[in-house]
């Protein structure tokens, strides 16, 4: 069975591996049932989900109707105002068929504007405290993607006494001196306060680039061989007092659980360096945060636009109730130095792609199409 340890200050004995239910975002009911049954085989007792993860909350809700006492359930919200966050929580409670959620997390709290809104008057933090006081949630946390997240989480902990944090952690990412320093400072603070540290991206190989997406891992191309997954998961589990959230693909889940089940000691840095070379591993956030994308010609422009839009989505640019028209998107990309010029057809096509994949919503107004995150 996968080992367990106390989940921060919550008093809960959680498996060191947490099921990341993005894997269920496109799953059928039969696939979801098989996946959740697999968790029980390995003794996994902790699920991380979110209302923006496609079918995930509904699939888990059907399962929790019979197995609620077997799992610690965490969900998230990307809403930044008190009212919208509470509405989002109500939706999650209904979908999950539960009276309360164990851990509610502010998702993607990694940009300054969103952070100020959440922490300010009428912000989502008020909803979090209110929901906890009413018994709708038990514990509160923050999550994020990208190179900036350790610093932002530290800032959040300095403002409010959150119970958990969630952020990327893998061997290659920790070779970035700036990220490693900020990450270690955050972990040190979390240990002092007994804040649970959850990590993601343990089996990330490299950005997808122009390669076909053969797995349901949105941000990155994953490692897929059992040996490579073993080494990566064992390296991540080598961080004491931390928890690893599984990758977002149900086909990879058995391999990740098998690796965690056999964990004894951390993979050596020498072995990890060899694997980086063997699999041509690359930092997955090298275009995010402070990167400035440039127009390098017609063959690369579309990819750059797509990556730039992903950054805006991560930063909360499209958060409801903001409905962004094409002209606003172009201006945002240009003003941040992400693009040197706007090419409307390419950007419009990239937006349409995000809509098809369910990451953005769109509707037509008198001034044209507008886009937002529901």
Tell me what each language-model feature is.
Residues 320-334:
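Short acidic, hydrophobic short linear motifs in intrinsically disordered regions
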Residues 300-323, 352-356:
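Positively charged, polyanion-binding regions of nucleic-acid-associated proteins
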Residues 7, 19, 47, 60, ...:
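Conserved, mostly hydrophobic/aromatic
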Residues 1-71, 127:
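N-terminal binding-site loop/beta-alpha segment at the start of enzyme catalytic domains
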Residues 355-365:
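A short, conserved structural fragment
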Residues 4, 109-293:
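Beta/alpha (TIM)-barrel catalytic core signal, keyed to glycine-rich beta->alpha loops juxtaposed to Asp/Glu
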Residues 56-66, 85-97, 115-124, 148-160:
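Distinct, well-ordered alpha-helical segments
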Residues 365-374:
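Short, cationic-aromatic polyanion-contact patches
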